[in-house]
Amino acid sequence: LYESLPVTVNNKKQNVIKKRWLQNYNKTLDKIYSSKLKEILGEFEMDNLKSETGEDFFGLFHESFAPLPLHVDTGFDENALIYKQIVTPLIEPGDTVFFKKRWYKQSTTFTNNEEELNFKPKPGQNARSKDHLGEIEFDKDMHAKYLSHIDINNLRGMEVEMIYNWKVGESLIVDRTHIHCASSRLNKRKLGLTTFTKRK
C-alpha cells in the first residue's frame, strides 16, 4: 500500500516523506484497519484531514531519515474533542519517547531556539513554543542514549514517561495530548503509520 500511494509532503528540512492513506487504494486493508480501530476504540471519528471529495484519510505514513523533534499532535481545530493517536511501526528499529507533560493547545513543535520561535505557521502547520520548559535539568544519561539529536537545554523540566520500542506487527494507542519525539536511535530510515482520532 505504502509504495503505491502518492507523496503528500517531502519535507527536506525535517528529512521526512509523508503519504496520506487514501480510501479505496486497497479496500480490503481499509476494512480490516477501520473495523479493528472501532473494535478497540469504540465510537470515534478520524481526524486526519479529508480528501477533495470529503472522504476521511485513514492516517499518515511517515518515512523519516532523521529523528523527528519534540512535538505534540493535538490537531488544529480548537473545538474538536481530540481522542487517541495510533502509531503502527512498519520497520525496525526505532523508538518514540513520550514525556509526562501534556499539551492542550494546537499542534506544536517545542523549541528553545529564538529564531525558530519567530516562525509564523500557515494553516495546517505546527505552532512553535517554549512553554514546555521547566527548571530541572534533563537526565544526561537519558539524553545521551535516546535524545542526542535534541539540545539538552530544550528538555529542561521534562521527564520521560515511556519509551516505546517499535515492533512490526504492533500498534501503540496513546492520548493525543502527550508531548513526544523520535529517539536518536535510527538505522538509516524509519517508516510508520500514524492515525489521529477525535470523539464523535
Task: Please describe what each predicted stretch is.
Residues 14, 179-180:
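Short, isolated positions in well-ordered beta-strands
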Residues 63-177, 183-200:
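Catalytic core of non-heme Fe(II) oxygenases with the double-stranded beta-helix
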